[in-house]
């Protein structure tokens, strides 16, 4: 074989090897795999309902289209599922957590949380907006949001001392200077809402499905309660923004400014802001075990980005969840996460003391 022919064969074979993908390159990371989709609250609740809608539509956007298997892991206010993801789940890319309020627990240093959530890869979060309402017959009468500062002493109902719901409304009320009695321990917002209807308590707050689905048609339109504000929502840079889900309402900071002519300030407001980002902007969070392969993290982030534009998913969500899901993905989500996880030790200590004071 002469030199020219040998050179031609060598070049030809080299080109073939370059344009022919290897079996590994052809096979997506998730092809033929199952993904355990861990939901940190019990079946039938809001987290479970939303999580299962996400799982149903997410798989088709993951290269390789794995099978997503929802699994409820309730307990300790949602912390049991978080501990499982951080301590037990294998970092093989085949476990995805879909959690309510993880960063709120980290910020409050919940004793039962044994893991550092900053070590768990962030995938995406879904924003949740909470609307606060009070009975209209609280003396001397609540007809509009700014009337709240005129209210005589009333009873405000929550779920537990260290829940994000209770923390946020207590901080907001203190900032406004309201006179109220704190009642907590209701098993759910359904129970608290019934207590409002019976006038056992006069205040509660709920997320979009509960507000749009029940409170608005049954209590607002009948004049029983008046919505006063929704908890603040922030941009990834930490700037206050209006919620497109409630164009007819104002945020807490907007109502405060209308009443007092200036924006709120101080450590309670800083604590409220951090709690709102942790519980509102990052109300539901998808995350993975520490050490998960980067290609798995990237694939799922891309899948959530595609899911956020999936009209079929959005239609299902609007039908069941009563709102248009708004995602924080990638760098935007990371910036918000850092604002919560890197709050000052002084602020963390203040929040813990604030919660403990309520127990006494």
PLM regions with names:
Residues 6-18:
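Bacterial N-terminal signal peptides
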Residues 20-24:
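Sec/Tat signal peptide C-region and signal peptidase I cleavage site
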Residues 29, 35, 60-65, 84-95, ...:
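Hinge/capping helix and adjacent helix->loop/strand transition within the periplasmic-binding protein
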Residues 31-33, 221-228, 237, 247, ...:
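An extracytoplasmic/periplasmic, membrane-proximal ligand-sensing/linker region
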Residues 37-52, 74-77, 157-164:
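Extracytoplasmic "Venus flytrap"
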Residues 50, 54, 76-79, 93-106, ...:
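Ligand-binding clamshell of periplasmic/extracellular solute-binding protein-like
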Residues 101-112, 166, 170-175, 203-263:
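A ligand-binding cleft/hinge motif common to bilobed small-molecule-binding domains
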């Amino acid at each position: 074989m002469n030199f020219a022919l040998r050179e031609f064969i060598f070049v030809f074979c080299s080109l073939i090897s370059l344009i022919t993908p290897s079996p590994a390159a052809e096979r997506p990371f998730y092809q033929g795999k199952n993904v355990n989709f861990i939901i940190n609250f019990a079946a039938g609740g809001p987290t479970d309902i939303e999580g299962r809608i996400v799982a149903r539509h997410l798989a088709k956007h993951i290269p390789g289209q794995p099978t997503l298997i929802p699994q409820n892991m309730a307990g300790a206010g949602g912390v049991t599922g978080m501990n499982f993801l951080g301590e037990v789940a294998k970092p093989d890319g085949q476990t995805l957590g879909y959690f309510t309020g993880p960063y709120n627990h980290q910020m409050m240093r919940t004793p039962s949380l044994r893991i550092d959530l900053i070590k768990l890869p962030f995938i995406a979060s879904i924003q949740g907006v909470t609307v606060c309402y009070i009975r209209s017959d609280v003396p001397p009468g609540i007809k509009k949001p700014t009337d709240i500062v005129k209210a005589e002493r009333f009873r405000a109902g929550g779920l537990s001392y260290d829940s994000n719901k209770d923390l946020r409304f207590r901080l907001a009320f203190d900032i406004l200077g309201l006179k109220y009695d704190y009642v907590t321990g209701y098993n759910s917002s359904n129970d608290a809402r019934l207590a409002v209807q019976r006038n056992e308590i006069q205040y509660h707050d709920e997320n979009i499905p509960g507000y749009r689905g029940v409170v608005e048609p049954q209590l607002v339109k009948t004049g029983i309660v008046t919505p006063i504000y929704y908890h603040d929502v922030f941009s990834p840079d930490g700037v206050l923004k209006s919620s497109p889900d409630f164009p007819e309402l104002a945020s807490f900071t907007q109502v405060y400014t209308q009443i007092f002519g200036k924006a709120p300030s101080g450590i309670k407001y800083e604590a409220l802001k951090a709690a709102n980002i942790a519980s509102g902007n990052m109300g539901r969070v998808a995350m993975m075990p520490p050490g998960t392969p980067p290609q798995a993290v990237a694939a799922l982030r891309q899948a959530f980005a595609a899911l956020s534009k999936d009209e079929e998913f959005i239609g299902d969500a609007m039908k069941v969840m009563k709102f248009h899901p708004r995602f924080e993905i990638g760098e935007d989500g990371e910036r918000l996460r850092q604002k919560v996880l890197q709050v000052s030790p002084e602020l963390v200590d203040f929040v813990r003391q604030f919660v403990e004071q309520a127990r006494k």
